[in-house]
């Protein structure tokens, strides 16, 4: 089973999670193609292969870099052999059987692919020990030992790239501020743990009355920062997420039964 990774870390987790489940179900080798994470591939952003910063215990896989040849074959399949190539949006129940195909090329952004394997998926995406440096361990304890509200603010290409913004709606400041005000009015001992690709914007546009820790600022320049941040987000009691797969995974992997607030 080949899975073609594309997009940022949140998207990669959806793709790899499904690939692992299907290769396990079919008892076959898993091949992970990373070609589309290469900035030289036309139409693609430069993305890190962040999924390999997670432990993936018990998963056997090989890595390939040959999507350029697959691209031509894909076009032929779409226009000439359409019955072998299906293009869908949303959840595709038949994918869960793994029958009739051996390439996963898409985003597969639905937890319903994992509905019977949630505990297993969570066990896959634990941070590799090599990244659990002292700073990470201390933050784990701080987040676990407080009434921690994780808030993730996604901006980046959503705010800066018009082509991305046209298809990915950015959350308004009022969405975050209403939740911050409501939660702080009900709970006096909240500590906010802020994760964002634009913490300057958060500082200038959102107001907190409670304690605040800007976690993302502590890992600037870390190659594994995205994986570390999702890992730390999972320790939060409650989550305020944005319109982002990165946000979604931080909340999905959480260890508590606290609430998740969504746009």
How would you name each of these model-derived features?
Residues 14-24, 176-183:
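Histidine-anchored nucleotide/phosphate-binding helix
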Residues 34-36, 153-154, 195-198:
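Short, well-ordered beta-to-alpha junction loops that form the rim of enzyme active sites
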Residues 42-188:
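Secretory-pathway luminal glycosyltransferase catalytic domains
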Residues 28-40:
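A short beta-strand-loop structural module common to alpha/beta enzyme folds
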Residues 5-14, 41:
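A short, glycine/small-residue-rich beta-strand->loop->alpha-helix junction that serves as a flexible
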Residues 2, 31, 150, 191-193:
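A structural signal for isolated positions on well-ordered beta-strands in alpha/beta enzyme cores
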Residues 9, 181, 185-263:
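Donor-binding and catalytic core of enzymes assembling or modifying cell-surface/extracellular glycoconjugates
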Residues 1-8, 35:
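Nucleotide-activated donor-dependent transferases that construct or modify glycoconjugates
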